[in-house]
């Protein structure tokens, strides 16, 4: 089991990234809440990881903190929740928001996540309620950075394209993803910030 990796952030292609560890490139899939907190490409970073071994693939998931990684592990223990749905939940809502939704048994918070209908949301909330009693809600660890410098047109188009691709990978329909990104008025955002704003608009 690979529990943690420390290296240089080599590539970011939401929701995937490449982490260079002593010349070996590890491809990881990360939730958007981790993507928002990543440093620039070329910077060092430590990620907590979870490895899923299948007959046809070995999939590595990365998280900015151990708490997020442990939360992911709690989610995939639930009946009918695989890594894809767990990442969609953690990308649409921060860990503390999910904990609050479970505490309040708020189905509406979960049904806005692609792939989660009312019955699924109700079942998840019931199953999670006892599991999450020990989870403490803490202040948000990150926020959107305002007043970013203008980006060249080519970078804007690339950021928008990356944001749309990331939303589609989370389960949103291409039309929904494109509409959500197009609705963002500030075009001088990175792909990570575009994804975050688009998700807030959808939820």
UniProtKB/Swiss-Prot annotation:
GO terms for molecular function: ATP binding; four-way junction DNA binding; four-way junction helicase activity. Residues 1-64 are annotated as: Domain I. GO terms for biological process: DNA recombination; DNA repair. Keywords: Cytoplasm, DNA damage, DNA recombination, DNA repair, DNA-binding. InterPro entries: DNA_helicase_Holl-junc_RuvA_I, Hlx-hairpin-Hlx_DNA-bd_motif, NA-bd_OB-fold, RuvA, RuvA_2-like, RuvA_C, RuvA_C_sf. Residues 65-143 are annotated as: Domain II. One of its GO terms (cellular component) is cytoplasm. Residues 144-154 are annotated as: Flexible linker. It is found in: Cytoplasm. It comes from the Bacteria. Residues 155-203 are annotated as: Domain III. Belongs to the RuvA family. Has three domains with a flexible linker between the domains II and III and assumes an 'L' shape. Domain III is highly mobile and contacts RuvB. Homotetramer. Forms an RuvA(8)-RuvB(12)-Holliday junction (HJ) complex. HJ DNA is sandwiched between 2 RuvA tetramers; dsDNA enters through RuvA and exits via RuvB. An RuvB hexamer assembles on each DNA strand where it exits the tetramer. Each RuvB hexamer is contacted by two RuvA subunits (via domain III) on 2 adjacent RuvB subunits; this complex drives branch migration. In the full resolvosome a probable DNA-RuvA(4)-RuvB(12)-RuvC(2) complex forms which resolves the HJ. The RuvA-RuvB-RuvC complex processes Holliday junction (HJ) DNA during genetic recombination and DNA repair, while the RuvA-RuvB complex plays an important role in the rescue of blocked DNA replication forks via replication fork reversal (RFR). RuvA specifically binds to HJ cruciform DNA, conferring on it an open structure. The RuvB hexamer acts as an ATP-dependent pump, pulling dsDNA into and through the RuvAB complex. HJ branch migration allows RuvC to scan DNA until it finds its consensus sequence, where it cleaves and resolves the cruciform DNA. This is Holliday junction branch migration complex subunit RuvA. It comes from Pseudomonas fluorescens (strain SBW25).
């Amino acid at each position: 089991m690979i529990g943690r990796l420390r290296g240089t952030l080599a590539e970011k292609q939401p929701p995937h990234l490449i982490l260079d560890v002593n010349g070996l490139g590890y491809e990881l899939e990360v939730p958007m809440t981790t993507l928002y907190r990543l440093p620039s490409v070329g910077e060092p970073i430590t990620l907590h990881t979870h490895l899923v071994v299948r007959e046809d693939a070995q999939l590595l998931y990365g998280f900015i903190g151990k708490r997020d990684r442990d939360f992911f592990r709690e989610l995939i223990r639930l009946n009918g929740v695989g890594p894809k749905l767990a990442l969609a939940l953690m990308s649409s809502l921060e860990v503390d928001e999910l904990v609050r939704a479970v505490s309040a048994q708020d189905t509406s918070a979960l049904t806005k996540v692609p792939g989660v209908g009312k019955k699924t949301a109700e079942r998840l909330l019931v199953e999670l309620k006892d599991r999450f009693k020990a989870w403490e809600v803490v202040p948000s660890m990150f926020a959107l950075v305002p007043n970013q410098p203008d980006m060249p047109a080519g970078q804007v188009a690339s950021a928008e394209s990356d944001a749309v691709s990331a939303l589609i990978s989370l389960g949103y329909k291409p039309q929904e993803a494109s509409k959500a990104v197009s609705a963002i008025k500030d075009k001088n955002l990175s792909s990570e910030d575009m994804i975050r704003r688009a998700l807030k608009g959808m939820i």
